Design a protein with these regions (language model features):
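Conserved loop-to-helix interface motifs that mediate assembly, gating, or partner/ligand docking
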Residues: 2-167
Length: 167
């Protein structure tokens, strides 16, 4: 039979664990409220964009006219594609990062190139010779300028003929 001292220590340990768990619950509840608020703030924008796109798409010509919409065919038949790889900055996204990297490595050929956004993707692909550029932007404050920074290299490589498609 356990001594009363051991029982008291065990009870205190359980109470401490309960306090920590409660604090974690409060923090996660606060973060969830903040995420829901952010979602509600951007929802009208995305709804409007979806509605606008759904009105415009039926009026587009059958054949896209801009060269960015065409995948160039190479004489050897093996196009050089660029993949914009979006991963998290930390490994706290469940299996998301692993699934993205697994799909990338299944789809990519030896001639393809990777533009990686996120620290997890960079750490996984940093020794891969197909890595062209990595972007260490945090996801906390996305901006139009960051989006331009990310796409300018891929667009320039496409225009110069180094790439035949961007995915």
């Amino acid at each position: 039979m356990a001594s009363s001292k051991l029982l008291k220590e065990r009870i205190e340990s359980i109470q401490d664990t309960r306090k920590i768990t409660n604090a974690m619950y409060l923090i996660s509840s606060s973060k969830l409220r903040k995420a829901r608020k952010n979602y509600q703030n951007v929802l009208p924008y995305f709804t409007r964009m979806r509605d606008t796109i759904s009105r415009v798409v039926p009026h587009l010509p059958d054949e896209p006219v801009h060269p960015f919409f065409h995948e160039r065919q190479r004489e050897d038949g093996d196009p050089r594609r660029a993949y914009l790889v979006l991963t998290a900055d930390k490994g706290m996204a469940g299996s998301f990062n692993q699934n993205v990297l697994k799909l990338l490595l299944e789809k990519a050929d030896r001639n393809d190139r990777f533009y990686v956004i996120g620290q997890v993707g960079y750490r996984a692909l940093r020794k891969d010779p197909r890595l062209v550029r990595e972007f260490q932007y945090g996801a906390t404050a996305p901006s139009l300028q960051r989006a331009r920074d990310i796409t300018v290299d891929a667009i320039d490589d496409f225009k110069s003929g180094k790439l035949d498609a961007v995915s």
